A protein has these predicted regions:
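Carbohydrate-active catalytic/glycan-binding domains of CAZyme proteins
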Residues: 1-429
């Protein structure tokens, strides 16, 4: 079945629409913390001193039947280590030059109960009993390349590493990307090439950029693909996934530019889309895909300050979005936790009425459908109705129909359902 998502504005004919407003469907949060920073826990994981943004990469490995999470963190941070939780509300966070980043790993059999296994790979304070995969790396992106034929290369990784050889004789002449972001990497389904979504700076603003590679070793220079609106809405990071042939992005949007604003120095999660990877726009301008929790640091909810998400994991009729939520402002003290929310498949945006007392009219550009079958994804209230008309190029109505009867599962604010259009007599009934 060919689907057309209202998310794609190219589907619509704006010259023949009225009283219609595009709305963003919100992700329903679990509100359950699956795991968190364990520096102050008992027993303590001393290397989990500050997750900061976390930049989670969540993968369900269908062959191994396991969920994997790869997340960035600070394994050394003197100010976080030296300031007890109860004292942080009284003190300004001061990051020092000695901070060291790393990459850690967690896993789960069901996506709900997570463990941090002792990997025995990286030495930390005299032993290897930890879940650290790498130290001195930042903003790591990990993906499972299901088209890779070599089983040892199925999991691929891109990261930022600062390295000095120590001799003082070798000058690095290669690229030096800023890349202090979630360096999100995937294989483009259209071209087979690898794509890296990273970040650059232009005119003092954070901007999403794209690099490409055919071999995962040699990469093109970063090219701007998406910027926000001034200082107030900057693209901090943007994981990308493909849905129904459309590129979807979940940008974390950083707010600065006005210290008097309530959202100053916080990070919201938005939804963006593109049909070609080069030109992006927000699905619904200024609306958050995952709402931050209520309150402020240190008493607020665990995700009241900053949100950074992973590309979704599909399961049944839903998409699950795992994310790192911080309870403080971006540059301040904050404790970060790992959680998730879900969205019904196909339900990214929906049209409703601007004026509830009047009907809304949506008109598409011409498209083909074969046979007599046409279905509409509907979530309508008790007092609502939907009608369908087929027009010619002059806008004259030729055929009328209505979606079939609503079921008990379809409720206002509940599940949406695909309803087959029942045409008027004489057309395929």
């Amino acid at each position: 079945m060919k689907k057309y998502l209202f998310l794609d504005r190219g589907l619509m004919n704006p010259r023949q629409m009225s009283n219609a407003k595009l709305n963003l469907e919100k992700i329903r949060k679990d509100k359950t913390v699956f795991f968190k920073e364990d520096y102050f826990s008992e027993p303590s994981r001393k290397w989990e001193v500050r997750y900061d943004n976390g930049y989670p990469n969540v993968i369900y490995d269908r062959e191994e039947k396991i969920y994997r999470c790869y997340y960035t963190l600070f394994i050394y941070d003197s100010d976080s280590a030296g300031t007890p939780l109860e004292k942080r509300g009284e003190k300004k966070y001061t990051p020092g030059p000695e901070r060291i980043t790393g990459l850690c790993y967690a896993c789960s059999k069901d996506g709900i109960h997570w463990e941090k296994p002792e990997l025995g790979i990286v030495e930390f304070e005299g032993n290897r009993k930890n879940n650290i995969l790498f130290s001195y790396v930042h903003g790591t992106g990990v993906f499972l390349d299901e088209e890779e034929k070599d089983p040892d290369k199925r999991y691929k990784l891109v990261t930022k590493v600062d390295y000095a050889p120590g001799c003082g004789l070798r000058k690095w002449t290669g690229r030096q990307p800023q890349a202090d972001t979630h360096n999100f990497v995937f294989r483009d389904h259209r071209t087979g090439r690898f794509v890296l979504i990273t970040r650059i700076w232009r005119n003092g603003q954070r901007i999403a950029a794209k690099c490409e590679s055919s071999d995962f070793i040699n990469w093109s220079d970063p090219v701007e693909i998406f910027r926000g609106r001034g200082f107030e809405d900057q693209i901090y990071s943007m994981p990308v996934f493909v849905y129904n042939g459309i590129y979807m992005g979940i940008p974390s949007v950083y707010h600065e530019g006005d210290v008097t604003e309530e959202n100053y120095d916080t990070v919201d999660l938005r939804l963006a889309y593109s049909v070609n990877l080069d030109n992006w726009e927000e699905a619904v301008i200024g609306e958050n895909f995952i709402e931050r929790g209520s309150g402020n640091y240190p008493e607020g909810e665990f995700d009241c300050g900053c949100i950074y998400a992973a590309a979704p994991v599909p399961e049944g009729k839903r998409l699950y979005f795992y994310y790192m939520g911080g309870n403080g402002r971006h540059t301040g003290f904050r404790e970060t936790s790992f959680s998730r929310g879900c969205l019904e498949k196909d339900c990214f945006v929906y049209y409703g009425q601007k004026n509830k007392a009047q009907e809304a009219v949506l008109t598409t550009n011409p498209f083909f459908f074969y046979g007599k079958n046409l279905s509409v994804l509907v979530r309508a209230g008790e007092e609502s109705s939907v009608a369908v008309e087929v027009l010619d190029n002059e806008g004259c109505v030729h055929i009328k129909g209505k979606p079939g009867q609503r079921t008990e599962n379809e409720t206002e604010g509940g599940s949406a359902e695909w309803r087959k259009v029942v045409w008027e007599e004489g057309f395929g009934n």
